[in-house]
């Protein structure tokens, strides 16, 4: 399903009844689908490994996804990059296997949901994760980040004034 609706800027049809339980790759699926705003919370995404840029530029998308079981996903790079309307809870997601979260909420200007319970010990890339996510101001003080995790510009251009993640070897910008 990788790239299936990539660039389909007018697409906004119901998909919630689709069976996606065998799918492993949803990279760029709604990339640039700027009008898309349909429910997807019933999708069984248990086997998906890749969600790279899945909703990148899906600027109208604001549907619940908290019921998704993302336990097997390893790549969420840019997943909501530019999804400017998105502001739904994701606190039930188990992200223990994710290694890449760079740019995940970059320019997701409405997003302001709790993520403090996420276990991010395995993440190696958080560069620009919240850059330009201008509404985001949730505590992340319980996050323990690896010393080798890239965190450049993680909170640049935000109003973030809450507890920051712990990175034992250096400061987070």
Residue spans for each PLM region:
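Negatively charged
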Residues: 2-173
């Amino acid at each position: 399903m990788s790239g299936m609706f990539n660039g389909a800027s007018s697409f906004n049809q119901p998909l919630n009844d689709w069976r996606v339980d065998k799918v492993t790759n949803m990279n760029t699926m709604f990339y640039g689908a700027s009008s898309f705003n349909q429910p997807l919370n019933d999708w069984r995404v248990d086997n998906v490994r890749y969600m790279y840029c899945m909703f990148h530029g899906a600027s109208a998308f604001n549907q619940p996804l908290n019921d998704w079981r993302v336990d097997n996903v390893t790549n969420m790079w840019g997943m909501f990059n530019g999804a400017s309307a998105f502001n739904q809870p994701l606190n039930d997601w188990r992200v223990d296997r994710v290694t890449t979260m760079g740019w995940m909420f970059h320019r997701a200007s409405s997003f302001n949901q709790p993520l403090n319970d996420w276990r991010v010990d395995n993440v190696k890339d958080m560069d620009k994760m919240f850059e330009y996510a201008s509404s985001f101001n949730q505590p992340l003080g319980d996050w323990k980040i690896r010393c080798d995790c890239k965190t450049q510009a993680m909170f640049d251009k935000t109003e973030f004034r809450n507890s920051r993640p712990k990175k034992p070897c250096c400061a987070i910008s």
